[in-house]
Amino acid sequence: MAYAVVRVRGSVGVRGNIADTMKMLRLHRVNHCVVIPDNEHYTGMIKKVKDYVTYGEIDKDTLVALILKRGRLPGNKRLTEELVKELTELPVEELAEKIIAGEIKIKDTPIKPVFRLHPPRKGYDRAGVKKGFSIGGALGYRSGKINDLLNKMM
């Protein structure tokens, strides 16, 4: 299983240890997304920054769309299915399955590990970016609903 983590809030007024954790997760700007494996190290980092990000389990279809639409190579070159197959020796769907299963990390491929997304179309549909998802906001854990948000942001 892999998590998609999207930074929702900015950097003004963020405590130093949380800002450092955001840097370690490569979430330098708002609407940046990373896909990370499910292990105790990353889980602890996510719990620390939960008041500034939203996260959940990403599915295969969303990850394939994310790689093809928003994935980039060094030099800001766009990705195509043929280019992904040439660079990783795997089709995009199989690459997505292996990333979700934890067999491959995105940082082990030539794909840039950060996906730069648009703000969500029609907004977050919630009470704002200062409240948790469980009480009507946009922050924190949102399980499979992260896929709907990512589709709105691609």
Swiss-Prot record:
PROSITE patterns: RIBOSOMAL_L30. The keyword Ribosomal protein applies. GO terms for biological process: maturation of LSU-rRNA from tricistronic rRNA transcript (SSU-rRNA, 5.8S rRNA, LSU-rRNA); translation. It comes from the Archaea. InterPro entries: Ribo_uL30_ferredoxin-like_sf, Ribosomal_uL30, Ribosomal_uL30_arc, Ribosomal_uL30_CS, Ribosomal_uL30_euk_arc, Ribosomal_uL30_ferredoxin-like. GO terms for molecular function: RNA binding; structural constituent of ribosome. The keyword DNA-binding does not apply. GO terms for cellular component: cytosolic large ribosomal subunit. Part of the 50S ribosomal subunit. NCBIfam families: PRK06049.1 (NF004711), uL30_arch (TIGR01309). Belongs to the universal ribosomal protein uL30 family. This is Large ribosomal subunit protein uL30.
